[in-house]
Amino acid sequence: MRKCSRRNSVGPKRISIGSPSLSAGPGSGLDFGFPYCHGGTIADPQFGSAGSCSTAVAPVQALEPHAAPLAVKFYTGRMFPAEYRGQVLIAEHGSWNRSKAAGKTGYRVSLVRLRGNEAVAYEPFIEGWLQGDEVLGRPVDLLVAPDGSLL
């Protein structure tokens, strides 16, 4: 499982292309499309036809635009209920350059629930670092401690 980012501020209107995504595959050497394709299907105009999005492995889970996922970990501990074991936790550092109308995203730890190799839910796991417009913190990394706690 790996995180794939997308390019930000592309073109004269400084648009974002696609969302960051979580990708996985059965082996190494797979083509997830980056940097030619974002979100598996959205071609990056900077590269033209240099890469083909039709052959890229689709992401397992699209993440919120501008969430800035900086760490991805499988929960391997035993402190939390068994339903969390083997699930994916993502430190979302958060947006800083979105328009006020678009709102801020990230500033949380998210959970991607898996059933086998399929993502079945993407939801907040730890929140509270964004209070209105005030930023109280921005998650950067995750560590599952030997006792199963999450740092």
Locate predicted features.
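Beta-propeller domain segments
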Residues: 1-126, 131-137, 145-147, 151
